[in-house]
């Protein structure tokens, strides 16, 4: 059960973290930690991000080729292997500057969950359905997720705890939004009908 919850948290809740994440800059950031092969980057990506944003080996190598082309990384050596040659890459000064700029550029907060709930609420009101019931059902779903995440944090490693905290804070914001919206349903109903 604990493993399933961990996989659930990593898969579902990190989607908000990496949904808009650029693979190119993320791989460049991973490579900034030190020179490495495409295989090393893929392993690092899989460890941190694959549950919510899988990346195929082909994407890794295609991205590395673009990074070389753009002057953000350089190939520093080639090692013979059992299969294809293993190319080792290193970030250039321009690449480091790109990573620094990327790290200092704030990510636009995603409102996807609220937008979906809002759309359902408006449509429910348009159809004279019970929008309050819809919000109650959504609130119950959010509360169930909060309980799962809270349990998960008890035995989780630091990565799991941090991801669970991130998800919990987003869920809390969603719940506040639902409460505010529920309190304004009559007002919204009038606006929808006008």
Segments predicted by a language model, with ranges:
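Long, compositionally biased intrinsically disordered regions
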Residues: 1-18, 158-160, 176, 183, ...
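Basic helix-turn-helix/winged-helix DNA-binding cores
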Residues: 6-111
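Amphipathic, well-ordered alpha-helical segments in soluble domains
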Residues: 37, 41, 63, 69, ...
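Alpha-helical scaffold segments that form or flank carboxylate-/histidine-based iron centers
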Residues: 56-59, 87, 159-170
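Amphipathic alpha-helical dimerization/coiled-coil segments
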Residues: 100-147
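Secondary-structure edge/capping motif, primarily at the C-terminal ends of alpha-helices
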Residues: 125, 149-156, 185, 189
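Heptad-repeat amphipathic alpha-helical coiled-coil interaction surface used
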Residues: 132, 139, 143-146, 153, ...
